[in-house]
Amino acid sequence: MNAGPSWNKVQHSKNSSGKRQSKSQVPHASSQPRSSLTAVTQPTEEKLKESISPEARRKRNPLGSRCQGASGNKLFLDFQSMKIIKENADEDSASDLSDSERIPIPPSPLTPPDLNLRAEEIDPVYFDLHPGQGHTKPEYYYPNFLPSPFSSWDLRDMALLLNAENKTEAVPRVGGLLGKYIDRLIQLEWLQVQTVQCEKAKGGKARPPTAPGTSGALKSPGRSKLIASALSKPLPHQEGASKSGPSRKKAFHHEEIHPSHYAFETSPRPIDVLGGTRFCSQRQTLEMRTEEKKKKSSKSTKLQRWDLSGSGSSSKVETSGHIRVPKQAAVILDSADSCKASKTQAHAHPRKKGKAESCGHATVSSEKKLKTNGVKQNTYKLK
């Protein structure tokens, strides 16, 4: 309703004088909104007052008077409080009253509860500032809550008699609810005795010294013992290397004495040797190569010896008796063991498989040659 006449004026100016006049009159119309608003609101208020009948006014008067009285009181209180706040905003009041006490505030509907508390009994001994001058400060005491015949009983001694010494007859019994109450107090006394003993045992225990190599952050003694034992023991790889060393030396001496018999004799613990370091494996390959070279040289020398012994006289053969026959059996057994060992080594080291197979073929050929030599010797005996 308020914007109606202003828009009508703008439209009329557009129709009469064109676009330029409308642009010039728009700010003029917007500069006078208050006059148009007042002109519109005055006749509307008069019309509303005339439309309301006098009977309705009579009905609304008593309710309106009450509301006006309540709202008037609230407004008066609010005005008074705001006045006091404005007066004391810049100046600090010297009174001890708070703002809620100085400013009148309507009472709240919630009333505080009435607490009927008994007065505290204050013992002047506990507030004595100089206890050393006069009488000594006594220990704090609790009032006796048990009746007169039972208040003199020592519940701690009764708990020790029942649980530690198992003397149930020495402890008096009481029936009813009071007896159950006393039994429960005795149980609590026994629990207190147990806790005191446990705490004393914990404090008396000395901490075990940790290993020098380990850090001091280890808390449990079991861990420190395990680590100390692990440090004292050597590693399994070191054990295998230390044990395989003398066994290799022994095998090497045997190969020097009987090179064809112990061509591929391994150490008693091949798993430890295989689990060793790379240095041990390289050393083993070098030893294998030297053994192969020695084996080839020993084959040629041994064949020459067998030929010389075969061309010898029959008397020498008969006097010798067994002509290295048991040694031939030992050769067969040792060669079989060496083949097994070579197979295990070939499975463990697939890269060295070709070398192991070639060595195995060489031992088989040496066995055949030895067998043929043995047959020649047997035929020589029969002749």
Curated annotation (Swiss-Prot):
Annotated Basic and acidic residues bias: 44-56
Region (Disordered): 1-70, 89-115, 200-222, 232-251, 284-325, 338-383
CC annotations in GO: cytosol; nucleoplasm
Polar residues: bias regions: 8-43, 374-383
InterPro entries with a match to the protein in the record: FAM217
Cysteine pairings via disulfide bonds: none
Pfam families referenced in this protein's UniProt entry, alphabetically: FAM217
Protein origin, superkingdom: Eukaryota
Family: Belongs to the FAM217 family.
PANTHER family according to UniProt: PROTEIN FAM217B (PTHR22145:SF3), SI:CH211-266K22.6 (PTHR22145)
Record-given protein name: Protein FAM217B
Organism per entry: Homo sapiens
Gene behind this protein: FAM217B
